[in-house]
């Protein structure tokens, strides 16, 4: 595990590595496909940028909609639980006791735990036991959607900038190599965040990227208008 400042950075960056990888793969696939089709530089650059913008907006919109729905669902569950605690506290205590019995506690201990947790914070105890949610920790749709969009855009910029900045015929090959290195890096970061052996995720991500770019490049060749 990483510690200190590096650990804090990794804690923030780590969860968004998959979105960065998505951005790299999506942008690279679009750029390599148009490069395979032999289009001019201006068309390739515009198509890559349009794909990057569309992908960024789509990722953010999907994440926002998903978390917004999750937040609304959790809010409804908390309201329902609060009403039940006010109108039928004994039944709710019995229900909480049975939940802990089903998880392996003896009936006596389960009852004691249920009583103590209810006395401390009844709503939190029941919400966490019954629904796996916390009243004080709710999803933040806008913040998380922006983070997902930023990660996707950051990843997607790399292959697009490679296509923009590298002149002439080598651009597709050089972009291919740059993307493989970037995906290997995201695979390594994911492995480090999970305390896994680093080689397999690196090879897997690079292999997926190579296959995706090869397929889109060949598809571009096959649909070449000329």
Question: Can you say where each PLM-predicted feature lies in the sequence?
Answer:
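Structural signature of hydrophobic alpha-helical transmembrane segments
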Residues: 169-181
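Cytosol/matrix-facing amphipathic helices and coiled-coil assembly/linker segments
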Residues: 1-18, 67-149
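The feature identifies polytopic integral membrane transport proteins across all domains of life
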Residues: 8-19, 41-49, 109, 141-146, ...
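Juxtamembrane boundary at the C-terminal end of a transmembrane helix
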Residues: 215-226
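Interfacial loop-to-transmembrane junctions
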Residues: 185-212
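C-terminal ends of transmembrane helices
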Residues: 61-68, 134-135, 187-197
């Amino acid at each position: 595990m990483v510690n200190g400042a590096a650990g804090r950075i990794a804690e923030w960056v780590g969860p968004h590595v998959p979105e960065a990888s998505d951005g790299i793969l999506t942008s690279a696939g679009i750029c390599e496909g148009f490069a395979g089709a032999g289009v001019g530089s201006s068309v390739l650059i515009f198509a890559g940028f349009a794909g990057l913008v569309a992908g960024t907006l789509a990722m953010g919109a999907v994440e926002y909609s998903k978390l917004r729905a999750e937040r609304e669902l959790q809010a409804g569950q908390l309201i329902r639980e609060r009403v039940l605690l006010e109108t039928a506290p004994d039944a709710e205590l019995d229900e909480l006791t049975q939940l802990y019995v089903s998880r392996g506690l003896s009936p006596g201990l389960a009852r004691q735990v249920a009583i103590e947790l209810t006395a401390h914070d009844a709503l939190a105890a029941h919400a966490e036991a019954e629904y796996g949610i916390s009243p004080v920790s709710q999803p933040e749709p806008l913040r998380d959607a922006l983070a997902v969009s930023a990660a996707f855009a950051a990843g997607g910029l790399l292959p697009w900038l490679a296509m923009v900045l590298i002149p002439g015929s080598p651009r597709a090959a050089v972009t291919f190599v740059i993307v493989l290195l970037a995906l290997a890096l995201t695979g390594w970061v994911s492995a480090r965040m999970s305390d896994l052996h680093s080689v397999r995720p690196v090879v897997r991500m690079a292999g997926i990227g190579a296959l995706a770019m090869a397929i889109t490049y060949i598809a571009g060749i096959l649909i070449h208008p000329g």
